């Protein structure tokens, strides 16, 4: 008998982006990407939404962080 791939009644945890007034001063801007900053050895995207920045989870590659930023930006355009 095969096991089900995931637990049926388990809640799906989704990431709720943090909002910050600005990227931290110790973050290093990645020049080749629009929204990606290097923070403690990981890549984090900061997207300006209204008056504050939304912060992505930490990624190991900058392309992933930029992809997240693009997706957040698209979702923001849809809701406005």
UniProtKB/Swiss-Prot annotation:
* BP term (GO), one: cell division
Domain of life per record: Bacteria
The answer to whether the entry has keyword Lyase is no
Recorded GO molecular functions are: DNA binding
InterPro entries xref list? CedA-like_sf, Cell_div_activator_CedA
The answer to whether keyword Zinc applies is no
Write out the entry's keywords from A to Z.
Cell cycle, Cell division, DNA-binding
Coiled coil residues, start to end: none
Give a short account of what the protein does.
Answer: Activates the cell division inhibited by chromosomal DNA over-replication.
Family the entry assigns: Belongs to the CedA family.
From the Swiss-Prot or TrEMBL record, give the protein name.
Cell division activator CedA
């Amino acid at each position: 008998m095969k096991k089900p791939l995931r637990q049926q009644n388990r809640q799906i945890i989704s990431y709720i982006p943090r909002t910050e007034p600005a990227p931290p001063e110790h973050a290093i801007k990645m020049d080749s990407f629009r929204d990606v900053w290097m923070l403690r050895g990981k890549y984090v995207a900061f997207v300006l939404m209204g008056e504050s920045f939304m912060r992505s989870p930490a990624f190991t590659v900058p392309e992933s962080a930029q992809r997240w930023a693009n997706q957040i930006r698209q979702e923001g355009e849809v809701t406005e």
